[in-house]
Amino acid sequence: MYEGKKTKNMFLTRALEKILADKEVKKAHHSQLRKACEVALEEIKVETEKQSPPHGEAKAGSGTLPPVKSKTNFIEADKYFLPFELACQSKCPRIVSTSLDCLQKLIAYGHLTGSAPDSTTPGKKLIDRIIETICGCFQGPQTDEGVQLQIIKALLTAVTSQHIEIHEGTVLQAVRTCYNIYLASKNLINQTTAKATLTQMLNVIFARMENQALQEAKQMERERHRQQHHLLQSPVSHHEPESPHLRYLPPQTVDHIAQEQEGDLDPQTHDVDKSLQDDIEPENGSDISSAENEQTEADQATAAETLSKDDVLCDGECEEKPQDIVQSIVEEMVDIIVGDMGEGTAVSASADGNAGAVEDGSDSENVQANGIPGTPISAAYTPSLPDDRLSVSSNDTQESGNSSGPSPGAKFSHILQKDAFLVFRSLCKLSMKPLSDGPPDPKSHELRSKILSLQLLLSILQNAGPVFRTNEMFINAIKQYLCVALSKNGVSSVPEVFELSLSIFLTLLSNFKTHLKMQIEVFFKEIFLYILETSTSSFDHKWMVIQTLTRICADAQSVVDIYVNYDCDLNAANIFERLVNDLSKIAQGRGSQELGMSNVQELSLRKKGLECLVSILKCMVEWSKDQYVNPNSQTTLGQEKPSEQEISEIKHPETINRYGSLNSLESTSSSGIGSYSTQMSGTDNPEQFEVLKQQKEIIEQGIDLFNKKPKRGIQYLQEQGMLGTTPEDIAQFLHQEERLDSTQAGEFLGDNDKFNKEVMYAYVDQHDFSGKDFVSALRLFLEGFRLPGEAQKIDRLMEKFAARYLECNQGQTLFASADTAYVLAYSIIMLTTDLHSPQVKNKMTKEQYIKMNRGINDSKDLPEEYLSAIYNEIAGKKISMKETKELTIPTKSTKQNVASEKQRRLLYNLEMEQMAKTAKALMEAVSHVQAPFTSATHLEHVRPMFKLAWTPFLAAFSVGLQDCDDTDVASLCLEGIRCAIRIACIFSIQLERDAYVQALARFTLLTVSSGITEMKQKNIDTIKTLITVAHTDGNYLGNSWHEILKCISQLELAQLIGTGVKPRYISGTVRGREGSLTGTKDQAPDEFVGLGLVGGNVDWKQIASIQESIGETSSQSVVVAVDRIFTGSTRLDGNAIVDFVRWLCAVSMDELLSTTHPRMFSLQKIVEISYYNMGRIRLQWSRIWEVIGDHFNKVGCNPNEDVAIFAVDSLRQLSMKFLEKGELANFRFQKDFLRPFEHIMKRNRSPTIRDMVVRCIAQMVNSQAANIRSGWKNIFSVFHLAASDQDESIVELAFQTSGHIVTLVFEKHFPATIDSFQDAVKCLSEFACNAAFPDTSMEAIRLIRHCAKYVSDRPQAFKEYTSDDMNVAPEDRVWVRGWFPILFELSCVINRCKLDVRTRGLTVMFEIMKTYGHTYEKHWWQDLFRIVFRIFDNMKLPEQQTEKAEWMTTTCNHALYAICDVFTQYLEVLSDVLLDDIFAQLYWCVQQDNEQLARSGTNCLENVVILNGEKFTLEIWDKTCNCTLDIFKTTIPHALLTWRPTSGEAAPPSPSAMSEKQLDAISQKSVDIHDSAQPRSSDNRQQAPLVSVSPASEEVSKGRPTAKFPEQKLFAALLIKCVVQLELIQTIDNIVFFPATSKKEDAENLAAAQRDAVDFDVRVDTQDQGMYRFLTSQQLFKLLDCLLESHRFAKAFNSNNEQRTALWKAGFKGKSKPNLLKQETSSLACGLRILFRMYTDESRVSAWEEVQQRLLNVCSEALSYFLTLTSESHREAWTNLLLLFLTKVLKISDNRFKAHASFYYPLLCEIMQFDLIPELRAVLRRFFLRIGIVFQISQPPEQELGINKQ
């Protein structure tokens, strides 16, 4: 302690002694100083002695360090200040220097703290006076240079020392003094030192503020931990929590653009600018409230101690931060500054708890301390809860009118913040000082001050910590001061100022953009883009702007933020869009001619423009990189690991991955402390922004339309739902939308249309004029639109205005009525025109104006002074619209008129001035506006950004590649295109992607249709870029693969030319051309023609140079890269590979279709990639193969056989490889794979290719049979196609292989082939149907029979087989997959083949049924017979009559009998299932116009019933009877009775040719219609005679050529019906009584009659073989009715002589008149038999009565009819019938006989008169005898009876 004092005393003593020793002090005017020094020395001496140390006390500490504070020496050094103060005030430089030096050391070592109150000025501390004294030493430029240096040193020490505290005005004074020294000093070293010192001071001031907040945050954090620990009683992690403040030191991203240019500064300076002092003066003397002094020194000491203890805790963290910030200049200061920063500041922390709000509007910073002493800091300032501190005052947004001072809502949470604020604000104001007029002088104070202030501001911003970046006070300061300053300096013509402004802007954009949304917009709109867009702006300005833009464009966050916050904001300008458009123009070199730039300048500007565009795209790529999948970092196959070389490629790929936004600006969104931004910004929802963007585009479109035609614009906006329909809505729109053309708005409002008037009224009513004077109101009204020219329009507007004005100001007494206001308004308009229009020469005087307005106030005058005031105001300022915010960019016309550089400069400066004004006005206007800023986080934004800007990008890159050979430009363009493709790919924006890829493809020069002249390096690079794109973005290229693969295809051709190799054309096409080539000398080689390189004659030199330039394309790297695209196809994802393959096939197709030279390059590649990709998952592979297979389909059918052969052979190899892999059950990949073989077989008619396909398939079967599964389908399909071929070798090979499969492969691999079992059978049936090879046909049917054996032997295999038809029950699968196909195909054979094969097929089909039918289910039979009955299907029968007839007589016949056999064999199963169908089928047969078939039908009916009747149920019998009934009814030939010859009917043989006699003879003859149809022999029923054409029709066709065909057809049909009727009668007879029974009976009856032995004993037939016994009486009656109906019809016909004659004449049935005798007799005979049989049947007693009744009626009717017969032959026919009748009657009992005999008696008597045959007579005799006996007329002689009985 003692040592410390000693040092201090030594300092003081030496300094005082030095001052006293100076000769100047001896002078009188320094007496006061001298005295003060002496007194001080004396006191020091006394004190030293008093405090000499006791012996033995150890020497504590180093003497130079400040003593440990205690009460005793707290203010010791301070009391010796007076001599120094006086010394400083002396004008002697030496004394001043000594004094300053001592003060500096005392402050530095902490001996002088100045904490005591200043005795001279109440409310101030001593330290303030000390600083003031130091600053006072600077007396302007004339101050001694040494003194200047000492002042700088002392002030730096004061500001940076941690032992003393200076705040507010004192800090400002210190800063200002250094600033002035920099400006005023002529000494370069002093200037440099002053500047460095300033930088360091600012660093310290701001760092202290940040540190204080940091400490406080830590303190809070500890508190929180402690409390948590207390609450939880659980261990809490001891890591420092990541408080938002820990990340406040930004990396210095923006380089110091303003490097200290000390060398340039001229030491000579003029007088210090007074205004500068004035500016800072008022900030002086701000007084710190006495509150802080009331706290006792003891409190401060303890506070300091506690804090310093705490500081130990954070030593580690705090240590480096100040070091980072403070750039030491004065070496000795470093040690002190590095010391604990916290200590000095901490003391005041408690004292200035919340040191007051800055009063609004006060320029001098008077701080009212409104804090209560000792208030804990946390109440005002809680860093860990930022929301508390950041609450945005509600006044903020409304405060735009009030431009000075921070908003009242914001408060400083600490005095250190206020210090920083004051310094910052002063610098802003300094930078705004205007420069003197004329060209800027680099040495002038104004300019140097401006530059320095901007440099310092830049430094502050670059090092800004979290508090500065988030505290509302600073944000407001930036808005209100810095941004306004920038708007002024941002258009400076001094490059250095301009450059600094840009750097500051960059920093703001980087760190503060979340708070400065509006300001950034103004800066971009009014400065950056304006300078880029104006043709007059200088190259330097453009260059600097574009340099800055390079930085902005390189930061992804900034780029996306600009789009989201401006282009998607309805009220903001489209900055991103404009930026891209402007850059694109610059990159295209547009507008540079007018500027008179040199070529070098133009090129460098173009490059920069391109660089910016590429940067923007890189940012977009970077921003969306998470969505990009690099195909080379993954493999879709996963079969082999990538090789070493590939790994290295992946690690350093030439891909876009290396493009980051390398020099990206540091963005607030990433800093934790940006809570302000997150709080203010809306959520980042891309969809929402897209909607906004769309709305904005609609609004912009609407405004454009409005500015051309208002009504159209409004209508458009209403249609789009962006504008309401009411007048109020539209009026509001006119008020709010500033982009509307004011003239058009005026025209719209003035229009006389009813709606327009309503809008105008609403528009005026939305103005509030209350409390405004009349002229102000009028100005306000006319601000928004330009008054229209027509008087009536103005009139309407003024009228409404006057009314509204009075409505708003009802209390006014000036105007008597609205009329007055209206007239006055009108007069004001006239006055403003008069006074301010250049056209009006004689201006109106005030008197004239007053006179003009006489008597307008309800015949009274308005006060003269009132009118006079109006006149004066208008004269001073005309009424005009407010200046529109948008600066109009000079039109084209002015651009061209710039004659010289000088004139351009002049114009530019004028524009700059205007621009600065606008920018400043706008900045001030928005300085209080709070606009939410969204920090973009979502990668989706890139999509709409790119969609918006892709065209200007493309234009720039295309033009660049097109017209510039500079390699940098080319590489930038290519890089840009790559990025653009990447973005379009990632977001699958197809149109844009395709456009860029096409552009690339175009610049490869490979696809041009005109000839290639020569390839430049840029074209080669383009090819490489294209290949790289294919490599890195393959997954996303979609349709763009087309362009790429087209180029690769052409590249191969180019390589061939480059290397001079003859292209490997397909031999087939080149063969013919070889000859022509050799002969002609001046013709180009083919390959050149192929590429379209040359026309007719050739310049060989040119070709040589082309070859050379193209040679580069076959460099190793290109070849490898191309190859890598194909080998790398395995890494493409599932969708991409499909696109790739699809387009590869398309290109291959183009190659092959080339008329001159088909090439197979791509086809070979297809084969290669098929090999590479075969290992993909089956799902992907099948999609790939769908495309490739289709391509092979087409190629395999190529008319060029060589191509087709290559295709088929490639297919074979691929298939072999594919089949080797085998296939699991239920998969179908082989089927898809082998399908092209089928297609080629189907479509290619070339025998060579067809043969080759069959051979390939045969080879596969032979070598891979074990692996084939679903592929069998295709194999059979191919053989199926081969089966119908006419080429024997093809059919033979195919059939051999099929046979091999069916006999051997099926045996071994049956389960694998089940799926294609049907196909196999189908294939065999196709062979069977090939009529050209009958042997094969028969063999094929044998193989089908063989297949049936497989089904029968292995039903289990079918049951277990599962496939697509999972809905088939397992037990039915045998049927569906096995039996059904076999039987179905056989039915097909039957339907399609010639007779012998058909018959064989039919036989086999029924053989299979008979052999295996026992295993069939009921419903199978149903399906089966559906097939079988197809044989009879009318639709399927042959068309031609003869064939049809043949078919019916052979196949149908055969089938019919076969069906009946099967039915009989499986009756139990089939009776339910099949009977109806069989009956239906039989019914069908009898309806056909085929006699044979009709006979067979009835025949089969008979067979079925006779064979199975015993097992029939009652129901079945009913059905049988009904069927018979139906047949009967259908086949009654009614038309025989109704037919009439048509009038023009050709007559029968003409009467002239025949005599009457002959005619009569013929007419007497009659022919039975049934005669031609031979009766069926009962013993051999089945072999019915085959009559194909009924003789009737034969007769007609031969004999009567004139007869009409329809008649023949009809007659033939009628004939068949007659036949069927007869057959049916026979059938019923056979069924009921068994075949041949009746015939036998007739024969017996005849024989008995001949012997005259008819027995009339009652005898019942019991030996019934027929079905009689199974039929019920009702059923029998039904049959009976049929028979009788048939009988009656025949009777009717036979009796109708006239009709028969007509038919005979028409040629029906030959030589004589037709009749139906057989039908007439046999039907009745059968009926009688049935009735008599029933009559004698004991079991049918119940029916006897009816039977008797029927018998009596039938018999009497028959006898009556017989009596009417005239023709002998007719009666003859009845012989058997009468015999039967009489015999039967004779055999009934007497009793019954009575009834019958009495009934018939008279009729029988009548019969006697006919000439009857002996047998009949014999029976009649018996009858009459019996009558005698029964009626007891006579007694029979015994002997006679006896004889009979024997």
Swiss-Prot record:
**Which GO molecular function, any one, fits this protein according to its record?**
protein kinase A regulatory subunit binding
Q: Which post-translational modifications are recorded for this protein? A: Phosphorylated. In vitro phosphorylated by PKA reducing its GEF activity and dephosphorylated by phosphatase PP1.
List compositional bias (Polar residues) regions by residue number: 391-406, 1574-1585
Chain spans, region HUS: 554-574
What does the UniProt keyword field contain? Answer: Cytoplasm, Golgi apparatus, Guanine-nucleotide releasing factor, Membrane, Nucleus, Phosphoprotein, Protein transport, Transport
Q: Where is this region: DCB?
A: 2-224
Which intervals of the chain are annotated as region Disordered? 217-248, 264-302, 347-410, 631-684, 1571-1600
Gene3D superfamilies reported in the protein's UniProt record = 1.10.220.20, Arf Nucleotide-binding Site Opener,domain 2
Q: Where is the composition biased (Basic and acidic residues)?
A: 267-277, 641-655
Question: What are the Low complexity biased-composition ranges?
Answer: 661-681
Task: Report the subcellular localization.
Answer: Cytoplasm; Cytoplasm, Perinuclear region; Golgi apparatus; Golgi apparatus, trans-Golgi network
Tell me the ranges covered by the SEC7 domain, including all copies: 688-877
GO BP: any one term:
positive regulation of wound healing
Q: How is its activity regulated?
A: Inhibited by brefeldin A.
Name residues in a coiled coil: none
Physiological role = Promotes guanine-nucleotide exchange on ARF1 and ARF3. Promotes the activation of ARF1/ARF3 through replacement of GDP with GTP. Involved in vesicular trafficking. Required for the maintenance of Golgi structure; the function may be independent of its GEF activity. Required for the maturation of integrin beta-1 in the Golgi. Involved in the establishment and persistence of cell polarity during directed cell movement in wound healing. Proposed to act as A kinase-anchoring protein (AKAP) and may mediate crosstalk between Arf and PKA pathways.
Record's protein name: Brefeldin A-inhibited guanine nucleotide-exchange protein 1
Organism equals: Rattus norvegicus
